[in-house]
């Protein structure tokens, strides 16, 4: 079949949506399907995949407003392409594409049945920003994107509701996301929806192979780079006295980095050789470093703006523990990438993170509570054997439920189902 994928993120925009769309498209193409990605224009070059074509459209470079301008231009291209190579299914990834009810109905009636992926919600994002601000994270009013979300989330939620109520099916990325839409967007209204949690690339994010000399050298280089390099650490032993904590994600307030930094003095009191490595792009780097200096932990904190997928995957393998203190996620892929890499994860005791993480594969702490975060990290660092068991269990969990192979089979079933229903009704 010919599948149109409308996604506001696509590599080289490697956000959560961009990553899952890239891998889903590649897996669909490997099954012999034709995939056309309609995405926002970018100065970089998208990685090529056989069977996947990419069409870029212009967009207004303003927070939130870009979702509407991008959607309008994407629809124009969709209509034009459909005339020469008809589409069988349209897969729209919300919330980064804002279509009206009329536009969704047009697609359904004149082009092809529509599947909407719900990657969280604008109203949920707004609640996350508010919770982060109340918890003393970096000033959210100073970030244009956070400010736009706080002020306009309610307005733009109408486009998400339009997708939920006017397409063949909506697929939420967690039970938590589906609950948000049921309670905030469509109380008492009829719609067709289900839940499929996204997986991760279990071949890229995999446990360490200590028999691979090149990989071992890469591991040692990372541990030396961050000064967490006692002999046990270099040998991947969980009993190391120089543990490496890893946090990955955009440097924005709702990711909870200030809470993590405030936990570090208590972590260092029990594990003085610990180092924290934060990897992410964003406006907060200087503020985070100032906070680290204020807390007298600068020598134990490193912030990297970004790196290649291979380097990132090696960081996951080389870390002793991944910490994910986010105040809001539609799903949150970092914990899966951590578990897939054989590294236990500490995250918040809130859905949707609790849909993937429990005490068999990691640890949970009260959201926004830096003392509880420190206690959870300390308990896990002090239990080397338990951490090894959690690492093994996490990898098994990912392979059993959370891979792109699972996703492609699930979405092919959905595509076929809405195609069949569309044929019966036409």
Regions found by a protein language model. Name each.
Residues 176, 199:
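Carbohydrate-associated surface elements
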Residues 227-231, 237-255, 261-264:
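Conserved donor-binding/catalytic core segment of Leloir-type glycosyltransferases
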Residues 122, 138-170:
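Membrane-proximal helix-turn-helix segments that form the acceptor-binding/catalytic region
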Residues 289-307:
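Nucleotide-activated donor-binding/catalytic signature segment of Leloir-type glycosyltransferases, i.e.
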Residues 344-347:
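Short hydrophobic beta-strand element within catalytic cores of glycosyltransferases
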Residues 359-370, 379-385:
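Conserved acidic donor-binding segment of nucleotide-sugar-dependent glycosyltransferases
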Residues 306-307, 314-319:
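Short alpha-helical donor nucleotide-sugar binding micro-motif in glycosyltransferases
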Residues 327:
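Aromatic "clamp/platform" in nucleotide-sugar-dependent glycosyltransferases that forms part
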